[in-house]
Structures are given as C-alpha cells and as structure tokens.
Curated annotation (Swiss-Prot):
Cofactor dependency: Fe(2+)
Family: Belongs to the glutarate hydroxylase family.
Superkingdom of origin organism: Bacteria
Entries under NCBIfam families matching the protein: PRK02963.1 (NF002814)
Function according to Swiss-Prot or TrEMBL: Acts as an alpha-ketoglutarate-dependent dioxygenase catalyzing hydroxylation of glutarate (GA) to L-2-hydroxyglutarate (L2HG). Functions in a L-lysine degradation pathway that proceeds via cadaverine, glutarate and L-2-hydroxyglutarate.
Cofactor notes: Binds 1 Fe(2+) ion per subunit.
GO biological process, one term: L-lysine catabolic process
SUPFAM superfamilies linked: Clavaminate synthase-like
Record Pfam families: CsiD
Protein name as it appears in the record: Glutarate 2-hydroxylase
Pathway: Amino-acid degradation
Keyword Iron: yes
C-alpha cells in the first residue's frame, strides 16, 4: 500500500442498516464494496419504470434522472448519498452492484434501466461516440478483427483509465455483464492507485506532468487528438491518472521508454485485484484513482460475452459532499 493514503474505516464498518439494499465488503478488498438490491426493491423498480422502454431513455435524457429518483425513493433516499460518499471516498471508490433476480440476457433492457438509474444518481453519463448513445453495448467472441484490445479475448486487456482520448470529464466508469456463454476466465482486473507500489516513483518523475498526445483508432469514432499529462492531482494534492497504453502517442524516445516502463510497472503490480462479475452485476468505479482491465479468456469456438458500459461525470450538491474526500 502506498504511503500517500491508508485505508480508512468505511460505511460497512458502522453496522448501518439500509432500506432496499444490503452493503458488505467484497472478498477481494475493503476498498471494493458489494451492494445488492433486494428482490422486493428490484421488482418494484422494474414495475415502476416498465412504461419507459430503453429507447425512451435514449431520446429523453431527463428520464434517466427520473428512473434514478424512483430507485432512490424505493431505498428510502439512502442510496444516492451512499453511492456518492463511497465513490468520492479515496479509501474506497468502487462498488460491485447487482439486483436479486436480474441475471439473464433476456433481461438486458432491465439491466440497462437499472444501471442507468444508478449512474444518474451520481452524475450524468457522457455521449459514447462508439455507440452513438449514452451507453455502449458490445460483444466479445472467440475470433476478433477489431482495431483495439476491447474485444480481443485471448490476451489481457491492460489496466487503464477511460476517457483518455476525449475532452469530456470522465469521473466514473460503469461496466455491466449482460451475457456470458462458454466462458472461463476473463475476470475484471482492478488496481487502486494507492495500492500500486510504484506510484511514488512514477508520480514524481519529470515526465509525469508533461502533456502527451492521445489518439483513438477509427472504431472509437473520435477523430480529434487530445493532449494531457498522464498524472494530475485531486483537490487535496493526491495523485490521479488519465492513462491508457493503447492510445498514448509518445513524441520521442524519452517518452516512449518511460511509458513502456510505466506500463510494465502497472501490469506487474502486486496490488491488482481479480474480480469475477456474474451476469447482471456491474462494477462502478472512480475513474481517477482506479485503473481497470480484463484477464484473458480460455479459448472456445462458441465463446460469447456481452458488456454494457457507461462513463460520465459526477454531479452533486457541493454543500453535502467533498470531491475526492
């Protein structure tokens, strides 16, 4: 663990009871909490949002906040503050969320509604240029000919932050498992910056704050390059990152060597968590101090995994919450 931030007591330690959901520490780390909506909450939520198909959420963006309010009301208005406090808490910042009874690809639309409600209790999901919507659904199969590692099954997708090649703020990332067939392996990989043993070395390097060019492949539907440093600081001066090895474009030998060494130091960290995410569950993480990736799959001719992602910015009343507390 890095000396910059120690794990503090979290909301789970208080023994607080919540209405409509349960909250426990994950088996992988006290930084990652597991939130489960009860069967009754799930049933009532899906009944109350049934009048709006997913297309309505796509066309009318205010409905995304309305379904969020419905879910929060069903949880006695305890859900929204819990989500924000957890995601803004540097000692935590990550949740594995599921709803009892939502665990089959036939419920894909219900999954999108649930994830949308949760995301819009903490902020707003950005436009995803790859899909043309506020969310993206994509499939991983046994054979892939795409132009990035996103869908390639037989190799590790290295740890990274999202939103590195766009100008929009990307405070959070939501990653949901919609379907899985003939799958072995492929766990989500997570690394909290303060558990990365090499953070001090790279954060204090002269190249850490140099603006670098980030460019996306054609499949991302983003044609404009963006420039920013790999490292920055939050409001309390603690390290945050905007990094992905596939899309950063070093301008010279010095940057190329440093980035290569940085990548190796991240991928070999002893602080990496391997987290299984069953169908219907989703990870919600603070994108500024958590890196995420994916382990490799065992080959199978009929391998299939469908995922849904949302990523966006935090929006909350500043008199109630402190950024990156």
């Amino acid at each position: 663990m890095n000396a910059l931030t120690a794990v503090q007591n979290n909301a789970v330690d208080s023994g607080q009871d919540y209405s409509g959901f349960t909250l426990i520490p994950s088996a992988q780390s006290p930084r990652l909490l597991e939130l489960t909506f009860t069967e009754q909450t799930t049933k009532q939520f899906l009944e109350q949002v049934a009048e709006w198909p997913v297309q309505a959420l796509e066309y009318k963006s205010f409905l995304r906040f309305r379904v969020g309010k419905i879910l929060d009301d069903l949880c006695a208005n305890q859900l929204q503050p819990l989500l924000l406090k957890t995601l803004l808490n540097r000692a935590e910042g990550a949740l594995l969320i599921n709803a009892v009874g939502v665990d089959d690809v036939k419920q894909a639309d219900e999954m999108v509604k649930l994830a949308t409600a949760v995301a819009h209790l903490i902020g707003r999901s950005n436009f995803d240029a790859m899909s043309g919507q506020y969310y993206a659904r994509f499939v991983v199969k046994n054979v892939d000919n795409s132009d990035s590692y996103l869908r390639q099954p037989h190799r590790v997708m290295e740890l990274h932050n999202d939103g590195t090649y766009v100008e929009e703020i990307t405070d959070y990332v939501l990653m949901m498992k919609i379907d899985e067939q003939n799958m072995q392996g492929g766990n989500s990989l997570l690394l909290h910056l303060d558990d990365w043993e090499h953070l001090d070395h790279y954060f204090r390097h002269p190249l850490a704050r140099r603006p670098m060019r980030f460019a996306a492949p054609p499949s991302k539907n983003v044609s404009k390059d963006v420039f920013h440093p790999v490292f920055d600081v939050d409001q309390q001066g603690r390290p945050v990152m905007r990094y992905i090895d596939q899309f950063v474009q070093p301008k010279d030998f010095e940057e190329g060597v440093w980035l290569s060494e940085l990548s190796d130091a991240i991928e070999t960290s002893k602080g990496i968590l391997s987290v299984p995410v069953p169908v219907g569950k989703f990870l919600l993480i603070n994108n500024l101090f958590w890196l995420h990736g994916r382990d490799r799959f065992t080959p199978h001719p009929d391998l299939r995994r469908e995922l849904m992602r949302q990523r966006g910015y935090f929006a909350y009343a500043t008199n109630h919450y402190q950024t990156h507390q």
